[in-house]
Amino acid sequence: MRKNVVRYLRCPHCAAPLRSSDRTLRCENGHTFDVARQGYVNLLRRPTKLAADTTDMVAARAALLDSGHYAPLTERLAGTARRAAGAGAPDCVVDIGGGTGHHLARVLEEFEDAEGLLLDMSKPAVRRAARAHPRASSAVADVWDTLPLRDGAAAMALNVFAPRNPPEIRRILRPGGTLLVVTPQQDHLAELVDALGLLRVRDHKEGRLAEQLAPHFEAVGQERLRTTLRLDHDALGRVVAMGPSSWHQDPDELARRIAELPGIHEVTLSVTFTVCRPLP
């Protein structure tokens, strides 16, 4: 956990500012949080029963992202973040539900002085994210709960294929800050719904996003990316294993279905990037 990031944090129990002392974060009311040797810190306010990504899911996602298959998405995200920031480069970028830190690391390359903080409920993901970039820090946090950040701490927030809590994101963003949300389109990975039992993207996802954000944010821009991925059998397995569909899959049956597909299978990547500003 970088000391430059600690100044943006607050205690999840009492909301007092957190300070760094040796390998411990503490607030004035005596709440303490040890920094793990891998560099992340657990800032959960209370235990959660929500399912977080497992070690296997995180490993599959890391392998797929590192392979470059999702590079069109990551590069478009970085470019959109750069354009949204304009002349005022952010000093603090928060990735909410950011997983392994792959996307945050690329965005940080656009802003040479920015500090990055990734929040996720998955400890295996946060552990990886702590070393995703020299200016990235990470913490275990429930993104549905009160976020462990001070009011107006962040200049930019990322939310890529992840849950979001609009009132809390609004609170932690400064006036004039940027929220960048990436959501799947109806045809995203559609070729794998029947072939491999992938969960289907729900109808009217964009409309629900707009309704969810409306009381707290104004959408000021939107871009779409649609491209074709050419995935081998290993990559197909990782696509399934890294997401919620993996909870419902029998590994042997999945392997059998993948083996029946062509050696290189064309799959649609289709997403929307929505740029938002907090409402007064």
UniProtKB/Swiss-Prot annotation:
Q: Which UniProt keywords apply?
A: Metal-binding, Methyltransferase, rRNA processing, S-adenosyl-L-methionine, Transferase, Zinc
Q: Which InterPro entries match?
A: Methyltransf_25 (IPR041698), RlmA_N (IPR048647), rRNA_m1G-MeTrfase_A_prd (IPR016718), SAM-dependent_MTases_sf (IPR029063)
What are the leading ranks of the lineage?
Bacteria, Bacillati, Actinomycetota, Actinomycetes, Kitasatosporales
Top-level EC class: transferase
Reaction(s) catalysed (UniProt annotation)? guanosine(748) in 23S rRNA + S-adenosyl-L-methionine = N(1)-methylguanosine(748) in 23S rRNA + S-adenosyl-L-homocysteine + H(+)
EC number(s) stated in the UniProt entry for this protein: 2.1.1.188
User: What residue stretch is flagged as signal peptide?
Assistant: none
A GO molecular-function annotation: 23S rRNA (guanine(748)-N(1))-methyltransferase activity
Provide the GO biological process annotations: rRNA base methylation
Its biological purpose:
Specifically methylates the guanosine in position 748 of 23S rRNA. Confers resistance to the macrolide antibiotic tylosine.
* Any one Pfam family match given in the protein's UniProt record, by short name: Zn_ribbon_RlmA
- Which parts of the sequence bind S-adenosyl-L-methionine? Y70, T100, G101, H188
Q: Which residues bind Zn(2+)?
A: C11, C14, C27, H31
What start-end ranges are recorded for coiled-coil regions in this protein? none
Sequence similarity: Belongs to the methyltransferase superfamily. RlmA family.
Domain of life (superkingdom): Bacteria
Per the UniProt record, the source organism is Streptomyces fradiae
Keyword Methyltransferase present in the record's keywords: the answer is yes
Query: What's the protein here called?
Result: 23S rRNA (guanine(748)-N(1))-methyltransferase
